[in-house]
Amino acid sequence: MACGLGYLQGATLAQQTMIIQNMASGLTGMICDGGNHGCAMKGIVATDAAFRAVDLALKNVCISGIHGINGKNAEDTMRHMGLIASPGMVQTEKTIVEIMEQK
């Protein structure tokens, strides 16, 4: 969504990369805790983050690759996000399910 917003606002390829870097920096780590009202809130947060990531990138502001999980380019960053999702979140998912089962 964020890159689509950037495209509609005339973002260059370099700015599209910045959008990806900004989104990864802002949202990576958000966890799914089951289908519930929290999902709607997470959708709102992600939408807000998309608009902010685009606004920053269009001003050539970007969280660089030396910070957090960001890589030297968008592809590296997305690869890092994939590693966090699997295998990185396997135990987290099990823990969330255990918490939900105990309710």
Locate each region found by the language model.
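Functionally critical mobile loop/hinge segments
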Residues: C3-K103
